Amino acid sequence: MSNTGTTGRIPLWLIGTFVGTAALGILAIFFYGSYVGLGSSL
């Protein structure tokens, strides 16, 4: 296996996994916050 798919010393798949997980976490927190906000306002 060659290191053509690496940026510096960090593999691209690791960056993609981290960014994807962070994006999913932010979306989950946003939807959860809006859901709780709607539930408390009703």
Curated annotation (Swiss-Prot):
Gene: psbJ
Chief place of localization: plastid
Top-rank taxon, per record: Eukaryota
Family membership noted in the UniProt record: Belongs to the PsbJ family.
Keywords on record: Chloroplast, Membrane, Photosynthesis, Photosystem II, Plastid, Reaction center, Thylakoid, Transmembrane, Transmembrane helix
Subcellular location: Plastid, Chloroplast thylakoid membrane
Biological role stated in the UniProt entry: One of the components of the core complex of photosystem II (PSII). PSII is a light-driven water:plastoquinone oxidoreductase that uses light energy to abstract electrons from H(2)O, generating O(2) and a proton gradient subsequently used for ATP formation. It consists of a core antenna complex that captures photons, and an electron transfer chain that converts photonic excitation into a charge separation.
SUPFAM superfamilies, A to Z: Photosystem II reaction center protein J, PsbJ
Classification via InterPro entries: PSII_PsbJ (IPR002682), PSII_PsbJ_sf (IPR037267)
GO biological process, one term: photosynthesis
One GO term describing the cellular component: chloroplast thylakoid membrane
Name of this chain's protein: Photosystem II reaction center protein J
Native species: Tetradesmus obliquus (Green alga)
Membrane topology: Single-pass membrane protein
Oligomer status and interactors: PSII is composed of 1 copy each of membrane proteins PsbA, PsbB, PsbC, PsbD, PsbE, PsbF, PsbH, PsbI, PsbJ, PsbK, PsbL, PsbM, PsbT, PsbX, PsbY, PsbZ, Psb30/Ycf12, at least 3 peripheral proteins of the oxygen-evolving complex and a large number of cofactors. It forms dimeric complexes.
Sequence intervals crossing the membrane: 10-30
UniProt cross-references to PANTHER family, sorted A to Z: PHOTOSYSTEM II REACTION CENTER PROTEIN J
